[in-house]
Every structure is written in C-alpha cells, then in structure tokens.
Amino acid sequence: MLCPSCGHDNLEGMDRCDNCMKSLRDLDVPRADATGGVVRSVMEDDLSRLEQEETVIVRPGDSALGVAQSMKESRKGCALVLDDAGKLVGIFTEHDVMKKLISAGESVRDVPVDQLMTRNPEALRETDSVAAALNKMAMGRYRHVPIAKDDGRYVVASITSVLRYIAQEDW
C-alpha cells in the first residue's frame, strides 16, 4: 500500500507508514456510496428481504422457564407472546432470561412469562425498510424486532438477520 503522504510502499494492512509514520488506517477500506450499494439497499429494501424464520410463539400464562427452554431448544433469541386472539402482547428475550428470570429465584418454575416480558412491543410491517428495523434496534437497544406479516403471522428481525442480509449482498 502506497503512503499518500510520502509515497513509501508499505505492506498491506499496516496502520502507519514505515517511512513517515502517517496513518494509513482506512485507506484500503471500501466506502459506502450514499447513492448506491449497501446504504441505498438498507434505506430502500423492505424487511421481506431478510431471512425470515419462524419464531417461538407463546401465550401470556405460559411458564417463563418453559419459554426459556423452548427458546434454547429452537436456538432463538426471543419468543413472541400472543393473546388468544393472536394479538402481539409481549416479547420475551434472552435479556429477560438473564436479568429477570434468574432474579426470580426459587419460585422460577411458577412465574408466567407475562410477568417478565416486555409488554406491547411495536411491530414493524414487512413493507418497512431494513433501515427502520436498524433504527428501532439502535434507539431501543434491542436485538430483536417483531415484524407483522401481511397474512397476520409474526416473525422476528434480529440483528443477526440484518447482518446476514448485508453480508450476502453483492455490493
């Protein structure tokens, strides 16, 4: 890599020029063009472009411990809590397991998930942009955002699914 300051030919990946010690950081990192590439796709592509896997669906009275076990078995980071009418009333996440369920102590087997879940999470629509999901995750410090599908079902956009979407695209 040529140093833009002195012209010295440095090894690829060097942080500083061996000759003049100027920073070479970020010189070989591709930049996103605000009018194309990853930025445009994240801003314009809707959430239907993300990998959509079925999620764990539970009822408010289900045992929080049982829900956590279902999440572990299915390798999911959250469970959506739906009432009998199929309305989203909560989300129960790995964070809830670590912070709330564990602190429930000996009575953990008796705690219903609706006492520990995050109530009334706002679900995005499939037609919302990937950027909308990223914004919700960043602002709320969430790793999972519910998505309401047109057919009435729910799926989850996770930070992992967003990163996979970005990584798989041919920019």
Regions flagged by a language model, labelled:
Residues M1-W171:
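Tandem CBS (Cystathionine beta-synthase) repeat/Bateman regulatory domains
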